[in-house]
Amino acid sequence: MKTLEKLSFPKLENEFLENILRQLVNQHTVIQMFFTRQPSFVFSYLIIHIEKNIDAQELQQNKWVKKVRKRYQIDVYFIYSERLHHRFSLGHPFIEFYCQPSAIIYQNKELENPLIVKRDWKKYKKRFNMFEDHFHHDHDLHLSQVQNLISEGSSNSVFTSYARLIEYDLEYLEELYSGNRSASLNLDERITNLIEYIPDIQKYFVRNSHSKYYLIDLFVKAKEASINDDEAIYKNEMYEAVGIAEQSLYRLIEERFDELKTLIKKGLFEKHDVVCQIDDKPEDVIL
């Protein structure tokens, strides 16, 4: 058992969260923690590298995770070891930037397989380009399908295909801003969540209620019409509105790629001295 009172995380500047993390380290197999403080108007990131997937899923649902996010603007993300290393191997830019050694605030030396990012931009560039190219390749395939359906005059199918393309865009925005996608949520919920990271999204999706968006409602109705083989009820000019929304999401993804690329290249993490101390616990490296 670890002596909880001897473990501290002064870099967090948050006593409430420190107390939770002490308990977390004592009760679960925590391999590492990474923390990046951001300006007050955007989320700071606390990434907790944990051994097992089942623990990561369970801990992510804890009420304190939402509380810390809402009250302190700290986004807590639990990720299990196999997934973290896999995403690192793919060149995932979120992982590359927010899991730099200078962001480590806790590391258990007794546990195997910590993530240590040692490569510089020159070594990482190829991975980054492959990751970004994969997005563009699949995006172009989705868009080509939409354009083919438009040329065929298949109105309802156009909107259901646009829905898949916009879902694809939202997945990448989630990955690039939070490190994880929210596949269990519907499109309305995913847009609402992303607004907290990217307020500009509100410009492209008009609400028709507190938690619903006009374009998403359009997609639902088009899907129902396709299933029931109903006549097309949408005018061609509606394609333009949907197309503008999709192009705007695409632009936001490109901007985020460029932002992460710049941050990684410049190495904008500060060089930290020791930010956590733990007495008489050599197995827990606090950096």
Regions found by a protein language model. Give the residues of each.
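Conserved NTP/Mg2+-binding pocket subregion across the NTase superfamily
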Residues: 1-9, 70-152
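Terminal, compositionally biased segments
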Residues: 1-4, 36-40, 44, 106-127, ...
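Metal-dependent nucleotidyltransferase catalytic core
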Residues: 1-27, 35-91, 96
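Short N-terminal helix-loop-first-beta-strand/juxtamembrane motif that initiates sensory/input modules
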Residues: 29-32, 155-156
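Amphipathic, non-membrane alpha-helical segments in soluble helical-bundle scaffolds
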Residues: 125-136, 155-163, 205-216, 235-242
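Generic structural signal for well-ordered, non-transmembrane alpha-helical segments
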Residues: 137-140, 163-167, 243, 247-250
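Hydrophobic alpha-helical packing segments in soluble, helical-rich domains
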Residues: 154-183
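Long, charged low-complexity segments
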Residues: 174-287
